[in-house]
């Protein structure tokens, strides 16, 4: 069972998973703003993962009667780009409408690809992807790589790590203008919006609305959240020295650790020695995936996973918010990043009052685009509705949300 010292150590390690300061001459477009505070004025139009689908975005804005001149604030939950036909068009629309956005995992990789292009390393990294693809065709990599090189982070070297960016990310980076790249790079990791005190109905009687792409770890302050996790997470596991960690959880912990180091190397232009030091740091944090359980116990702080193994983070967040007696200390999270599950907007999948709303409707896979429209009521409170259009542009009916 995890002790208080174990919990303090894990929290410190989670808070410490940040990119170290680097030379500005070699680090392009790293994440500069962790949390940005936004004032609630007019309606909030919070749009799910667009993934370069400009016609769906235009249809959605038309359906919600978006009007910037009337005070509407357009917000994107990240992943505006990649996988679709017109990422430059989507980004330009966001710029033209003074929209707010957060950095999703796709923006992060494309910005890392742009950094590599600026350093003249794109050809080398693309060639490495081609070599990996050829090797995968010839052999079953999972069977031929020794177990220790996969599971023991201290035995991993830089050449064992895949590039952080996919091959397609370089083409996406090249398709965007300098202005569009700079705009994407300027967006924060998290948006925080203070809600009016007059609201009395759950969940809008909470004190804060948060927009984060992938998820958040309960009990960790926003400023201390691990950026990689905020952009990529779906599940949580908990420290438990007596637990027999499943192979699936262990593999995902190791995968996430390597991905963090790949991100570090991409944005830092890091040396082999610096990458080795980061791998050692991650090894100390994750202990090769041992001693973690997917079973939540009161008081434990979760460790984020990219997969849904263990405890789903939205369940953990909803439990935590419902345990806070003062409603004004509670926080609603609107997020994206989970196309496989799709929209998560109602009470049906939560055993407690919902304080999380997932807006990734699967636009990247032809399943339409959705937005949450948050508006002030006559009594000063708030209400919301979910509006969706399908991939062909034929809008579906509005669904009333909590008021």
What is each residue range found by the language model?
Residues 32-40, 66, 91-94, 191-204, ...:
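A short acidic-Thr-Gly-centered motif at the start of a beta-strand
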Residues 70, 87-247:
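Active-site neighborhood of divalent metal-dependent phosphoester bond hydrolases
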Residues 49, 79, 94, 104-105, ...:
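Divalent metal-coordination and catalytic microenvironments
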Residues 51-55, 82-85, 106-111, 217-219, ...:
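Active-site environment of divalent metal-dependent phosphoester hydrolases
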Residues 2-91:
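N-terminal active-site segment of His-dependent metallophosphoesterases
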Residues 4-23, 39, 231-403:
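Acidic, His/Gly-rich catalytic cores of divalent-metal-dependent hydrolytic chemistry
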Residues 46, 76, 101-102, 210, ...:
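Residue-level marker for buried hydrophobic side chains located in beta-strands
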Residues 43-51, 209-215, 357-359:
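Active-site-proximal beta-strand elements of phosphoester/diester hydrolases
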